[in-house]
């Protein structure tokens, strides 16, 4: 019963999900601005103070555009991991900011805090302005539960075979519009603008006719490039609407999306712009293609890009020449996300490559005259389990890796030409600096002394190792700078107001670099003596990260409509560039003119545009005191068809979920309850505690504690038989079955991310309340009695491993491995035979003690045969150790969560073994169809076979094992743009027919079909 409820109870967590990570190693403080609270740990103090300043400054202009002002917003600032992002929890009035500045190859250079604070706060304002109800009601739910046929006389009803839960949210803003308006923020800020990276992405898509469709723009769930393309296209279309129809239309569209029965942006467009979504999209698309073709015309007449030498993957970066016509580089090929990139070695002539090191996203450098490379990668092997960068050396010939720094947050290393030093960047409190160590990782030396959010990138040693050249950025441009290896004599080499990056020295002491000075990133060579640059490429997309060999042949990362590829350009081809044949850059794209909202005159825009974040106001610090978000309420209506004899009204069970969390995720509470006309109840409460515990914290053990309470009741009318031979002496009465359970668990990460160990204590009590009745043919009233037939306790230890590879299909068709190992020690008092004794005139149950050990293994292996096709194995083995115990404690084999060929309660025993083999493949991907508020993305189909049994006592022969065959269809969708929707349907056939005698009744199973289905948020149940 609890398992059924748990599957349904957890549904609202999806719509209100957070990064449920709280690191108790840190002290937390709070400062208060005019409109905001900022919570931070001392290591992020500067970042927190700047954020308080920025948030108060941008509050007025952003709220003015949407004519909506939220309640005070809580910012949570983290500088724990080497991770850069912002996240807005618009139902909780909370924004999380990671202090590390974003360095993303698909984005240009901007001031991180000015950009991310304005971006996330715009999310808060715009999305709340577009809500249909108060933010405390995120969604309503409709739920449907159907159950297997009840056959066994000892159960009230079967296990669920259909589970449907579907939200009707109070917000339905498409992804492109949410992200487009957030990037737009207020255009005059110029904190985020239509930079050359954004133009590059959109230009390549438009010229190759690969723009995201109107439907695709509405949802995420794509690759790294695909998701960024939603941001990119959304920003472009938002600017188009603002410039053509007026900035005020952004507000009007937002407000129309908040109308009660408006669930698509097409309807909002029609009301505000007089055209539906497809009309606006086609109008914008036609303009883009025509405009880009005109502006790129001269470049196409003199295109100098070389040949593609690595076409696989959409993220190929940081190439360096190795030896014998070989290139070492970083690539995400074979993966859907840039975070899964690895180091490869490529032969330029044969175009064949091999992987050297897994999971590396940094630059790579070669130790001269060796077979060793130096790089950085993320890891959590440190006292605080923080996910940070450190430097490693890999010996290609020996296939050996060695870590040389520990906890430095060192990234993007480069080795000196004498092989003795390594220069790298490191991050602290939102500022990056250059550091240097010896080749073995010792003798750290700080080279730059930035303290105010400045960013440095891509350091390289000069040929004589006397200085380091690198990128520098503070706002909307990048400079190429240098500093002596002593830490003295900082100077700027190239500063022109554009984005200049990725310098790499040539043999003659000059350097090549990438610059967007023409509006398109191209490779240039800078003459150190004459201080002039020569253009080496003339591309349509973009050219980055150049490297040259001794003959001045060039390899670079070039952007195309399919992502970043590696290009090879010979020395001879580099001389063919005609600098007059260049791109026509538009300063205020797309249309060149604005139709502003006209509300900014009352704000000090000069101070917002020409900001000075070096001077930060003083704020009073206070110890964080546990701010909780407002309660969120999720009303629901459940149709619960567990007893077919119930009337329609009895099956309707209204209810409510409630949740709240403190802003640091130290504590959270989640509760729910439902009740029907018969007063059958489903109640639960979950409280999570993530703060440090005495003693354990001194050993760097920080478990998450959870308290769970369950109270469930079900009612039935049963016949009491006093004389089997005389029906007139029998009577009926109501019986209420009650389950009460308390769980206390402690969960802790072990070894590394994806591995958890959980210890749990479970106390459960099962009882039956028998209603009063009159003994037949008498006037004697038997009073209502309560029979507690089980008092159980369980100590459980569970280890979970999740090794699922992140892919765009990891929900519908996972790849990788999951397993769970579980041990229980149960000590129960159980009235097996319904035996009672009279104590003080009252019937008391006579309990028998059942104390036993229990072990269980659940293993899932998902093997990719070819792209999209997987062969999957599920293995489950379980046993109650020692002598047999009553079937009340049995394992169950079948049903929706097991061997689907047989009903859940059909096969049970003290021991269990089951093997499932399935083959899953796509029937239809990239469907890209929208029906109203529903977006249909992909359909997968699988066939599977089952072999398993459950037994008590001696191991049965294999011929007694049950066999089955089935098929499943899965459809992945999105509802209301933002909410994942997963439909599944199974049909399974049981080959083996068998009977069981239970309470003197013969029950037969097998040689029949079983059907299952559901609509949930994912397929992980």
Which residues does each PLM region occupy?
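C-terminal transmembrane beta-barrel domains of outer membrane proteins
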Residues: 653-662, 668-716, 726, 731, ...
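Residue-level detector of Asp-centered blade-edge/turn motifs that repeat once per structural unit
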Residues: 322-324, 368-370, 417-418, 463-464, ...
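Beta/coil-rich, acidic/histidine-enriched accessory regions frequently appended to metallopeptidases
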Residues: 19-22, 27-30, 225-229, 253-357, ...
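Acidic/His/Gly-enriched intrinsically disordered linker/tail segments
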Residues: 23-24, 92, 112-116, 130-244, ...
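Hydrophobic beta-strand positions that form the internal "hydrophobic ladder"
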Residues: 327-328, 373, 422, 468, ...
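Outer-membrane beta-barrel initiation region
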Residues: 576-697, 800-812, 832, 911
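Juxtacatalytic substrate-recognition/specificity segment
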Residues: 17-167, 174
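A flexible loop/linker signature enriched in serine peptidases of the S9 family
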Residues: 195, 312-316, 331-343, 355-362, ...
